[in-house]
Amino acid sequence: MNLLSDSPLKIYFSGICGTATASLAILMKNRGHEVQGSDENIYPPMCDLLEQNQIRVDSGFHQSNLEPKPDLVVIGNALSRGNPEVEAILDLKLPYISMAELLKEHFIRGKKSLVVTGTHGKTTTTSMLAWVFETAAKNPGFMIGGIAENFGTSCRDAKGSFFITEGDEYDTAFFDKRSKFFHYLPEQLILNNLEFDHADIFNSLDEIKKAFRLMLRLIPKSGLIAANGDDLNVQAVLRAANSPIIRFGFGEPCDLSLIHISEPTRRTPISYAVFCLK
């Protein structure tokens, strides 16, 4: 059986209530697969979204949750060795995969992949980018680390040729310690900012920079990187890129400069900012 085919499968998500994992479970159910999962921390908004999509969530991690045996288990990155379901999956030799790898093979591969990265602002930027493509009638697929109010969901399959993903630098799974964004086949990428974060998996800012440098090397020469031109840490990792770069920000090195515009004389004063090509 080809576990990465679109043939209907019985798929079990261990650690289903994470934002990305719950979103992927919904996408897989919408593709016609039989989906259920388990978690210990079951709380809104993702548990509500799963319930709305009629996806059963078992409370707690138990070997009995895996009976009858599923065709495939998706293991969330919060689960590690010693977890009862992880140990059962290994003992029973069940096929398993990470959330990021499944997302890549079922939804991103074959599409034009746009990935939003950086320490802060990923969810907001991904939501805005998806909405821009939506209003341009591009019908993008997307995976956002939160529920976007404009869409009423955190994820959607692509009807058009684009898939937009929030690219997290956190690790993929206990069996794959690479950052999740390595899986997303980036062709065009936004890099918002870069500073030390995730001290539970990174020992220093230099380790985070290394992960971003490696990720930038995955972007083809025909791709594009839009990066914060004011962030010194971002500028440091951009040296690893082999793709065209557009810098945005306030400073002189930026190709797109942010200009603040204020019109206080209007009956209703407005203040906004726009990017202008130099």
Where in the sequence are the language-model features?
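ATP-dependent carboxylate-amine ligase
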Residues: 1-46, 50-57, 68-73, 91-94, ...
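Phosphate-binding loop of NTP-binding sites
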Residues: 4, 27-30, 51, 64-68, ...
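Histidine-centered active-site/metal-ligand motif
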Residues: 12, 33, 61, 120-121, ...
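Short, hydrophobic beta-strand segments that form beta-sheet elements in well-ordered domains
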Residues: 35-39, 58, 73-75, 141-143, ...
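Short coil-to-beta-strand transition motifs
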Residues: 252-255
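Single conserved hydrophobic/aromatic residue that forms the stacking wall/gate
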Residues: 259-278
